[in-house]
C-alpha cells in the first residue's frame, strides 16, 4: 500500500493558494484537508500512488541534485516511511531545496511522508546513485501495491 502525505503550515501572513501552488510544483495530490492549530492552518495533502511524485522525480534530474536528494531520502527512512522536508519559499518559485529542520525555512518547511513496503526501492527510483553526476541506473516507478 502506498501513501504519500505532505504537511505544511499556512501562517496568517501567507496565502493558502500560494502554499498549495508551491507544493504542486513537486506533488500531485488527490485529497486536501485543513485543520487549525491556534492562528495557523495546517494543510494536509494526500495521494495513494507514487505517480503523485513524478514532478518531484523530474525536478531532481533537472536540478541535478540526485546525490543530495539521495542523502536526505536515505536519512529519512524509518521503518516503511521516508520523511524529509523542503524549503517552502524556494518551493514557491519552483526550486527544490532540502532542509534539515523546520527552522531553516522561516515560514515553516514543507514536510513529505512516503509510506511504502520497501522505502529503499522508492529512493532508488527517485534518486539513484550517480557516478560523475550520471545516474548508475534508471529504475521504473515501483508498483503501487
Curated annotation (Swiss-Prot):
InterPro entries, per database record: PAB1135-like, Ribosomal_uL5_dom_sf
A Pfam family per the record: RNA_binding
Recorded coiled-coil stretches: none
SUPFAM superfamilies attached to this UniProt entry: RL5-like
Record field: transmembrane: none
Signal sequence annotation: none
Family per record: Belongs to the UPF0201 family.
Cross-referenced NCBIfam families: PRK00447.1
HAMAP family per the UniProt record, alphabetical: UPF0201
PANTHER family, per database record: UPF0201 PROTEIN TK1335 (PTHR39652:SF1)
Name this protein carries in UniProt: UPF0201 protein M1425_1179
Organism taxonomic ancestry: Archaea, Thermoproteota, Thermoprotei, Sulfolobales, Sulfolobaceae
Amino acid at each position: 500500500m502506498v501513501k504519500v502525505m505532505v504537511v505544511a503550515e499556512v501562517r496568517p501572513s501567507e496565502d493558502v493558494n500560494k502554499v498549495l501552488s508551491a507544493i504542486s510544483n513537486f506533488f500531485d495530490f488527490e485529497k486536501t484537508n485543513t485543520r487549525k492549530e491556534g492562528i495557523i492552518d495546517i494543510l494536509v495533502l494526500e495521494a495513494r500512488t507514487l505517480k503523485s511524485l513524478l514532478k518531484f522525480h523530474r525536478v531532481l534530474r533537472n536540478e541535478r541534485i540526485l546525490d543530495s536528494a539521495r542523502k536526505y531520502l536515505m536519512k529519512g527512512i524509518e521503518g516503511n516511511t521516508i520523511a524529509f522536508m523542503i524549503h517552502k519559499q524556494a518551493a514557491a518559485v519552483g526550486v527544490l531545496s532540502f532542509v534539515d529542520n523546520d527552522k531553516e525555512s522561516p515560514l515553516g518547511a514543507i514536510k513529505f511522508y512516503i509510506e511504502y513496503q520497501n522505502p529503499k526501492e522508492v529512493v532508488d527510483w527517485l534518486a539513484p546513485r550517480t557516478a560523475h553526476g550520471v545516474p548508475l541506473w534508471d529504475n521504473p516507478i515501483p508498483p503501487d501495491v
